[in-house]
């Protein structure tokens, strides 16, 4: 191969490279997606757990919504107040303080308090177990199945199954709501962090059925409802419920509960 051919090939390759470079540069400018600097800053301030507890598809979705003014600056339940304040500063807003929430499991039917109707040896998954006739092996068809689907769903390790019932570590809980969505028995709810009074039962069975299934289940006697000075507790469908916005944690309901299910 002579020197002329080598030079020609080199020039051709250089020309092709230059053309591609110019083409990509022009295309990059033409099709460039504008980046919202505030959105980027908000995204960097978020913890990055992508838990979905905010109601958006991950931290990117929440950051975009906050930047557009479609979500509150304190919309991240994981970051809480500290992250909310940082994002508020980025957006030039004042953060509206909200009460911290944590998950709570409304069941006290431990292995000692309830019994199994039969020995279950299948897949240990609450959602699958809930489809079995009778709603599971436990004598109470409303209670915690104890297989830990909520434990697996929690990205923060805030839930454990203790003696057959799921228990939440309120200090580790970030109120992302994944356990709430995962429980097939709908036993888990988000409650105020400062709340200290709870009805540890979700059964809607009548009194006799409850006493035969669980040693501590609510029998719907309404003694707690009558004792509450604030009208914060009501019995609906044979089970007591607390309105946390009215409850002062006075303990009057605890004192009169014959089943000691209010703690």
Report the location of each language-model feature.
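Strongly charged, low-complexity linkers/loops
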Residues: 223, 233-235, 239-241
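Ferredoxin-type iron-sulfur electron-transfer modules and their immediate structural context
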Residues: 2-227, 231, 254-256, 260-263
């Amino acid at each position: 191969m002579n020197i002329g051919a080598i030079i020609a090939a080199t020039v051709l390759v250089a020309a092709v490279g230059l053309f591609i470079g110019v083409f990509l540069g022009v295309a990059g400018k033409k099709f460039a997606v504008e980046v919202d600097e505030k959105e980027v800053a908000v995204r960097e301030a978020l913890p990055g757990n992508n838990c979905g507890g905010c109601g958006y598809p991950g931290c990117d979705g929440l950051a975009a919504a906050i930047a557009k003014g479609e979500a509150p600056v304190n919309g991240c339940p994981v970051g809480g107040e500290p992250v909310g304040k940082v994002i508020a500063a980025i957006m030039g807003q004042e953060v509206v303080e909200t009460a911290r929430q944590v998950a709570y499991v409304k069941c006290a039917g431990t292995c000692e308090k309830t019994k199994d109707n039969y020995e279950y040896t299948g897949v240990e998954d609450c959602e699958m177990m809930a489809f079995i006739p009778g709603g599971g092996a436990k004598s109470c068809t409303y209670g915690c199945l104890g297989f830990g689907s909520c434990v697996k769903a929690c990205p923060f390790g805030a839930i454990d199954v203790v003696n057959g019932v799921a228990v939440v570590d309120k200090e580790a809980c970030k109120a992302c709501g994944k356990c709430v969505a995962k429980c097939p028995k709908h036993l888990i709810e988000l409650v105020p962090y400062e709340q200290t009074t709870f009805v540890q039962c979700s059964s809607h069975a009548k009194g006799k059925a409850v006493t035969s299934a669980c040693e501590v289940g609510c029998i719907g006697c309404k003694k707690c409802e009558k004792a509450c000075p604030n009208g914060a507790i009501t019995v609906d469908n044979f089970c007591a419920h607390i309105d946390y916005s009215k409850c002062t944690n006075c303990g009057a309901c605890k004192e009169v509960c014959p089943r000691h299910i209010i703690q």
